[in-house]
Amino acid sequence: NVASFADEAQQHRSIAEQLAHQANLVNRAKRYLAYFQAYTSTFAEVQVLRSMYQQAVSQANIVGLCVGTRPDCVPDAVLDLLCEYKDQGYEVWLELGLQTAHDKTLHRINRGHDFACYQRTTQLARERGLKVCSHLIVGLPGEGQAECLQTLERVVETGVDGIKLHPLHIVKGSI
């Protein structure tokens, strides 16, 4: 349910316009990372992604990219593209929406991937020198404190550079 998470007005602006608008809102910062998060930011042909990412890094004060996606939507060609930006000196973060390390829960919430897929994607990204941040959800149905701690342990073991914890948030119209 993207409408709950994305400003409708932003959806009709160019990447340059969105970045300029957000920079004005947080004008105390001097440098920015362009954050591609809405939808799956790697689910397009590489030339389309290159155009989007290039629009972002060509803006003043943009020093890198944060690209949010699912672990099952990161083919080698996309990892190679992200490496091109890293090799040009940009800071590049691949943010993976894992949610949990428990396959039973991933199946229950219809994620379409398992923990092994996440591990593979993380390993491939880390081998290329990309920074990886994992998004996890606390409070998923059927999971308690023990499962949350197990997820954290398993994710840390993959060598990620960052973890973002989110509470379970059910949005009207999403179920």
Where are these regions (language model features)?
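Core AdoMet radical
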Residues: 2-46, 61-74, 91-117, 162-164
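Surface-exposed amphipathic alpha-helices with a cationic face
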Residues: 20, 24, 82-87, 119-127
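Distinct, well-ordered alpha-helical segments
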Residues: 46-54, 75-86, 146-148
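Non-catalytic positions within long, well-ordered alpha-helices that form the structural scaffold/packing
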Residues: 57-58, 83, 156
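Short, surface-exposed connector motifs at secondary-structure boundaries
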Residues: 59-65, 131-134
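Active-site-proximal flexible loops/turns
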Residues: 75-77, 102-106, 142, 171-174
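Conserved C-terminal portion of the radical SAM core fold
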Residues: 116-174
